[in-house]
Amino acid sequence: MFNKVEADIDGKLISIETGKLAKQASGSIVISCGGTVVLVTVVGAKTSNPNVDFLPLTIEYQEKFSAVGRVPGNYFRREIGRPSDQEVLTCRIIDRPLRPLFPEGYRSETQVIATVLSADQVNSPDVLALTGASAALSISHIPFAGPVAGGRIAYIDGKYVLNPTFAELESSSMDLMVACTRNAIVMVEGKADELSEDEILGAIFFAFENLQPLINLQDELQRANGLEKIVVESPVIDAELKAKVVEIAAAGMQKVYTTVDKLERGKVYDDLKKEVVAQLDTEEGLRASEISSLLSDFKKTYLREKTVNTGVRIGGRAWDEIRDISSETEYLPKTHGSALFTRGETQALVTATLGSERDKQRVETLNGETSRRFMLHYNFPPYCVGEARFLRGPSRRDIGHGTLATRGLEAVLPSEEDFPYAIRVVSEILESNGSSSMASVCGGSMAMMDAGVPLKRPVSGIAMGLIKEGEGVAILSDILGDEDHLGDMDFKVVGTCDGITALQMDIKIDGVSRDIMSNALDQAKRGRMHILEEMSKGIAEARAEVVEHAPKYFIHKISQDKIRDIIGPGGKIIKELSAQYDAKIEVDDSGLVKMFVANGALAEALVERVKSITAEVEVGAVYTGKVKTIKDFGAFVEILPGTDGLVHISELALERVKDVTDVVNEGDTIEVKVLDVDNRGRIRLSRKALLG
């Protein structure tokens, strides 16, 4: 049955309809705002998959170029291959708030596909896709504890703006994505221009209050068009077996809790599991998996309660204690900049490389082709967690972590006018036990300063966690991998001494109040300040100049009518200069010549050569030139690179000359004076004028 519901959200009409498109899907909706239209479908298998012990949920997001009336620019002229980074990031934005809302034990294959059908290049489709995914799940048979509403928050002239246009975002000091249910914030992600904790917190709860109409809209649609939800039976727990597991494992779990080293802690737990299974597995392996599951549940409960009740975390740290930090720069001799950053058992080796305008990343989006001057690539090889597996391309997680670090560092980059290099930062995670993306931020900041990038201020990042047991709340700084897995919140904050530049928050439970979030932000700030202080021991400020083996940058302004001289016919001159001086040379339409020279020793020579090629010929000036061509009526002399003038036979000598070659020959170097430049640019020279 076709149905359409609408709501005015902060002055913008958002509509959700169902019953017209993709009716064979388990749930299908079309959500629109202005001229932006997104189709979201969800399909869930009717039966559970017995071969998996996790939620088999897949999220896909597709941007069709037909949505903006364009043909893809690739050879095949169609959308092919892997999704773009933007599509991957939107998949993650949709996935993270939805995944915790499926019931435990739901094991049916489920796929959500969001397709951008029309884009007006004013209203962003990603926020619509998030809300649309929730709406499609809500009307399907799939069990889902939603609905969820998503929105983007801007901060313009001291005011929060919900779902700003692309033009409004250009003048905003914040770009924050927020997702919420009726009762709680469930996801936050975005960047800011060094804003305060209070300004960030205000944005989050501004979104929560103003997104409630979208929750109501989905409830209305679900009441009218929703299918009956399937019931997921909760697994029956053998209370007697559970009690035995707890009794046998209690003493050993304390050893797990107090073991500091990650690998050793894992070994202690594995030994404990073998012991418990050996004592209780009396049915030839039939109950081993059940015993392991009960032991895992006990571990989670034990570690959570121990942390909240004792004020001491896994490994013995206090709630706000940061692991030991060490850092150094200039670790790699031939990179432009490098830093080794280690925090506990998390280690990142980060490099910074400087490039020219041509090294910018070209990106084709629905809003047109753009270029990225700053790139940060995050790599997470299997050995960093002691595993062996095939090396693939970057995963969705890699892209997401790299983007978070990118956002955190972008706010402190110098302007392109002050520092015209393209910058590529690569973070290789060598060890991982929590917050490797934040190690990438710290290492990236240090590597760029080591390369001579004049950052406005150093940047650090910290991963926070939360454990809420009854009335007890533990806010944890610099969380471990185990604390991330067992906790109720993963909250990453990036910033400088002046404010927050990026953050990412995933909350798994209801009931995280504004006070708890405020306390978490304040505790994160104290942690960031401590980390910045530790980083300053490795490098406190950027080098005064880029390193010797980095490309050197020079600019020279020429008149627009000289652009053709520096380029030459078919690009001949500029190609010759690039090859001779090992340089990248770019000339824009205004006459600005940008030169990136790989060998600093050749830089000044290139600049002088460019100046000579584009110099204006002055009447009355004397030049030393080379005879290029001999004619019966005189000799053509090159007085500037690519600029020839004629010495008429009558201007070669004081006496009468019968044959030009009696005075000069091709290849001779002579001094000449400029007599005249006519309106066609022809230059008249004289040798005779210098002989009297």
Swiss-Prot record:
The keyword Nucleotidyltransferase applies. Its main location: cytoplasm. This is Polyribonucleotide nucleotidyltransferase. Residues 551-614 form the KH domain. It catalyses: RNA(n+1) + phosphate = RNA(n) + a ribonucleoside 5'-diphosphate. It is found in: Cytoplasm. GO terms for biological process: mRNA catabolic process; RNA processing. Its EC number is 2.7.7.8. InterPro entries: ExoRNase_PH_dom1, ExoRNase_PH_dom2, ExoRNase_PH_dom2_sf, KH_dom, KH_dom_type_1, KH_dom_type_1_sf, NA-bd_OB-fold, PNPase. PANTHER family: POLYRIBONUCLEOTIDE NUCLEOTIDYLTRANSFERASE (PTHR11252), POLYRIBONUCLEOTIDE NUCLEOTIDYLTRANSFERASE 1, MITOCHONDRIAL (PTHR11252:SF0). GO terms for cellular component: cytosol. Keywords: Cytoplasm, Magnesium, Metal-binding, Nucleotidyltransferase, RNA-binding, Transferase. Involved in mRNA degradation. Catalyzes the phosphorolysis of single-stranded polyribonucleotides processively in the 3'- to 5'-direction. Its cofactor is Mg(2+). Residues 620-688 form the S1 motif domain. It comes from Desulfotalea psychrophila (strain LSv54 / DSM 12343). Signal peptide: none annotated. GO terms for molecular function: 3'-5'-RNA exonuclease activity; magnesium ion binding; polyribonucleotide nucleotidyltransferase activity; RNA binding. Belongs to the polyribonucleotide nucleotidyltransferase family. It is an enzyme of class 2 (transferase). The gene is pnp. NCBIfam families: polynuc_phos, PRK11824.1. Mg(2+) binds at residues 484, 490.
